[in-house]
Regions:
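Outer-membrane pore/translocation modules
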Residues: 25-27, 84-185, 190-218, 252-253, ...
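Predominantly the C-terminal beta-signal and adjacent terminal strand-loop region
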Residues: 61, 229-275
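Outer-membrane beta-barrel "beta-signal"
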Residues: 71-76, 169, 188, 262-275
Length: 275
């Protein structure tokens, strides 16, 4: 039932914004940002990019253990004017331009759970496994310049296990306007108590089973972060990309026994073939 509700919300949002979209010149990409996949080359209709990436990342939120993981890359996309509908891995969504300065979008994504076995050192023993689920993500960027050199970014994540919001500023580097080059975003993240305790809380039963102190977090500041994205066309078909993320947790999160590290980090690189 929740999947149906999320899909209905997604379609309603798209329909509402679609009426407000302004006609624009035919550009190779919707916006010239390396973090935004666009394989349509400015043409309406279907587009496909498939590839693979390798990530070196924290084993779980707050972990001091790291490991490599292979991830699929790319997406199936369908473009209609200033709107792109897409299916990418574990997410289905839409993004569109309201005008020259506003990029908005919505998606339904798959949220991975957490298992005790995620920690090779047994740091999660006794905490139990968390089920996988779905989340609704609403996103918006507001550019300060016509060429998307500087912008504000916001994102809201809603699920039945809590809510999270991100706000920040970004900058694009390089003179390209085809979606290649690099960009950086500086952000801060807030969460409600449900979302905070999902990742870092310990209830009475978990405390008895794990030996860790019972912990209950309140809502508020979660972290400060910086992320970097890079994209380059090797030729007309092949594309490489890279990304890096660093997130420094707030004092309340750092005080949780689950947070074995004060930060979360991730580095990834991959290759995509555009059909």
């Amino acid at each position: 039932m929740k999947k149906i509700i999320y899909l209905a919300v997604l379609l309603l949002i798209q329909t509402t914004f679609n009426n407000a979209v302004m006609a624009q010149e035919n550009n190779p990409v919707l916006v010239p940002l390396p973090s935004v996949d666009d394989f349509t080359e400015g043409e309406d209709g279907w587009a496909l990019g498939l590839g693979i990436g390798i990530e070196y990342e924290s084993a779980y939120e707050g972990s001091d253990e790291f490991g490599f993981e292979a991830q699929p890359a790319g997406a199936v996309q369908w473009r209609s004017g200033d709107n792109i509908y897409y299916f990418a891995g574990e997410a289905i969504g839409w993004r569109g331009l309201l005008n020259d300065n506003w990029l908005v979008g919505a998606l339904i994504g798959f949220e991975e759970g957490r298992e005790e076995s995620d920690s090779d050192d047994g740091r999660l023993d006794g905490l139990g496994n968390q089920e996988e689920g779905f989340e609704l993500v609403l996103q918006a960027r507001r550019s300060f310049t016509p060429d998307w050199r500087y912008w504000l970014v916001s994102r809201v994540v809603a699920s039945d296990e809590g809510n999270l919001a991100l706000f920040g500023v970004g900058r694009r580097f390089g003179e390209q306007t085809d979606g290649t080059g690099s960009e950086v975003n500086l952000v801060f993240v807030v969460h409600d108590s449900d979302y905070a305790n999902k990742g870092f809380g310990i209830n009475a039963i978990q405390s008895l089973s794990s030996g860790l102190e019972e912990t209950k977090l309140s809502g508020g500041l979660r972290s400060f972060g910086i992320d970097y994205n890079y994209r380059e066309n090797l030729n007309s078909d092949w594309q490489i990309y890279g990304e890096a993320l660093f997130e420094y947790f707030s004092s309340e999160v750092r005080d949780s026994p689950i947070a074995r590290s004060n930060f979360e980090a991730e580095v990834g690189i991959g290759v995509i073939y555009k059909f």
